[in-house]
Structures are given as C-alpha cells and as structure tokens.
Design a protein with these regions (language model features):
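N-terminal pre-catalytic "stem/leader" segment of glycosyltransferase-like enzymes
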Residues: 1-104, 292, 327-330
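Short alpha-helical donor nucleotide-sugar binding micro-motif in glycosyltransferases
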Residues: 83, 228, 232-238
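Catalytic core of nucleotide-activated saccharide and alditol-phosphate transferases
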Residues: 90-194
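Conserved catalytic-core segment of nucleotide-activated headgroup transferases in glycan assembly
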Residues: 166-228
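Acidic donor-binding loop of glycosyltransferase active sites
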Residues: 236-250, 263
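Short hydrophobic beta-strand element within catalytic cores of glycosyltransferases
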Residues: 264-274
Length: 342
C-alpha cells in the first residue's frame, strides 16, 4: 500500500535520506523541514531531490501560519489539513513538539486503524528521553531504533523495529586514497568539544598530515564549510579517516558515508564516551570502523602506517567497504522500511 507520510525531523542530512528512501519505496512523503520543497531545499548539505513528488497545498498550509518559524510551529502543531491528509507521522528527537499536541494526535491515531505515529531515534536519545517516552509508547507511539546499543540507555522505552541509517553505495564510492592525509568530517569539531572528542583528534593526528572538514574547522587548520561535492571528493582522495564520535550518538551518518566510500576509518574507543555514565555502552563506532583504540597514540601509529603504505590502505578499504554495504547499504535498509510500513 502507498502511505501518506509526514516527516517532522530535526537533521537535514537524515531528512534528505529519509525523503529519498521512503519515496523510492513508493510512498507519498511530505516533510515539515528543510525539504518541504524537495526540489529547492533550505539546506545545501545535501542535494535537491527534484524527482520527488511535491505537495504545494500542504506546503501552503505551513507557509501561511504566519509564525517567525513556520516549520517549528507546524511541527509543534501539525496543521489540520496536513493531519487529515496523513496516515503516518514520523518524528525525530524533538519529541516535546509531538507530546505537546498528543491529545489530538492520539485522537487522530484512534480514528483509523491504518494510522501510525513513529519516533525514529537517531542517536540523540538519553535517559530522560527514554523515561519520558514510556507513557506515550503505551498509547500507540511506535519506535524505530537505529542501533542495538540504544538498549543500554537506562529506562529504555523499547522499540518496534531496529533499522539502520543507510548510505547508497552508488553515491558513496570511488575511494582512491591518492592524497596521504587524515581527515574527519564533523560540524564544529573544536567548538563542541567534549561532545566531539576534539582532544582525541588533536592527539591522534598531531604531527600527521591532517585536515578536519566542516563548519568551524577553519579554527583548527581546516577549510571550514565545504560543498557537498568537495566533501565527497575529500572522502575519495584522502588516505585515512580518524573518527572521534559525537556523544551521545552510537554512530553518525558521517561515519557511514566514510565507511561505504571506502576510506579506511580508525576510531576512538568507547572509554572516551563518558559525558553520560552509560556512554561507553552506547557507543558503536569503534565496532564499525576498521580499527580502534582508547589510546590516541596507538590510533596515531595505525594512521601513520596507512599514510605510509598505500597497499595496506587499499586492502583495508576493500574489506571495510564490503562489510559496510552489507550492514548499511540502501537496498537492505529500503527492504526493512518497506516491510515495516506495510
């Protein structure tokens, strides 16, 4: 069956991926976010989706709210016309926007057995979110988790499905490693420390040819914001990637894109995920990467070897990419979402 899905997400890159994926399954997808018009997104971190169906009447219902933040207002109270149109609603981690209108959403949900409201967790849930969600889960809120490690959060509210983030291997490919440099793609790596573990990056890459990428990287020797195509080119050409995580996420889309592109990824270990007491048990990035250590000196030694030995890097790349596609490739994840939304 074709579902009429309203997305109320809080991550423009994941929004792009979800609009693309769910539309490719055959569903009608309307996003209350940067991709409200898929052909002209508000954010340039990912490309436009001109082939995705547009819904101008639904967009008008948001545009005419007259708020200083129409998207936030529409997520906080879905306009009646959009609610009448939808049979499936999916939220990310700003769940107060959902809970604040829960009585009318609950009534809507009970009005038709085909209707569904789903919390898609994306690596931002902590103990408070989980405990708050429990009564809503009892009243019909579904949950699609993105990592098995989420179950280690105290008070975990449970899930109805575990479906990974994905990366399309036809989009994320072409690694050559011709430039002996270590990179990382993270927004505000230095500014958001300790959540981004910038100190580990600094120690593990000190003395190596390195280049952090992303907004804010200009203060630590990087170019700052780069275009989507430039970022992809860096993933293809750089020899190695040093991943330091973003707490409390188990893993990130940036990690997946690196893994599937094939650039050898060496990760920070879980011991550094200590902002939350349960952080080490929540982290998964080190298990997905090609190597890891809690010791930045050991990570540096592996990175140095990759920089000096392109043949070794090539072997690591081939194994890593095949494993990443098997776990996170678009075909696998598309089939899982298709089955869940039947």
């Amino acid at each position: 069956m074709t579902r009429r899905i309203v997305l109320a997400l809080s991550h423009s890159i994941e929004e792009h991926d979800q609009v693309k994926l769910l539309s490719s399954i055959g569903h009608d997808v309307f996003s209350i976010g940067g991709y409200i018009n898929p052909g002209a997104p508000h954010d340039d971190k990912r490309p436009a989706l001109p082939d995705v169906k547009q819904f101008p009447l639904l967009q008008r219902a948001v545009d005419e709210l007259g708020s200083s933040d129409n998207l936030g207002a529409a997520q906080s109270r879905i306009p009646d016309g959009i609610l009448d149109w939808a049979d499936t609603i999916i939220y990310h981690h700003y769940l107060d926007r959902l809970y604040g209108q829960w009585p009318r959403i609950r009534d809507w949900l009970r009005g038709d057995s085909n209707r569904r409201v789903i919390w898609r967790s994306v690596g931002q849930s902590v103990e408070g979110n989980e405990r708050t969600a429990v009564p809503f889960r009892h009243e019909g809120l579904e949950r699609v988790a993105y990592s098995p490690k989420e179950q280690n959060i105290p008070g975990y509210a449970g899930h109805d499905a575990l479906i990974r983030f994905y990366a399309d291997p036809e989009e994320w490919k072409g690694w050559t490693g011709t430039e002996p440099v270590v990179i990382q793609v993270t927004q505000h790596l230095r500014q958001r420390d300790p959540y981004t573990n910038w100190g580990f990056w600094e120690q593990a890459t000190r003395g190596l040819n390195r280049m952090p990428l992303g907004p804010g990287s200009e203060v630590i020797g990087g170019p700052g914001s780069v275009t989507y195509n430039t970022m992809r080119g860096c993933l293809q050409n750089a020899r190695a990637y040093c991943y330091t995580g973003t707490q409390p996420a188990s893993y990130t889309l940036g990690l997946l894109e690196a893994l599937v592109t094939g650039i050898p990824v060496i990760s920070i270990g879980p011991a550094h995920m200590n902002i939350f007491e349960y952080g080490p048990d929540l982290f998964e990035g080190h298990e997905l990467a090609s190597g890891w250590s809690d010791d930045p000196g050991k990570v540096q030694a592996v990175l140095r070897k990759l920089l000096n030995d392109p043949d070794e890097a090539r072997m690591v790349s081939e194994h890593q990419r095949a494993r990443a596609i098997a776990e996170f490739g678009i075909e696998k994840v598309r089939a899982e979402w298709a089955a869940y939304l039947r």
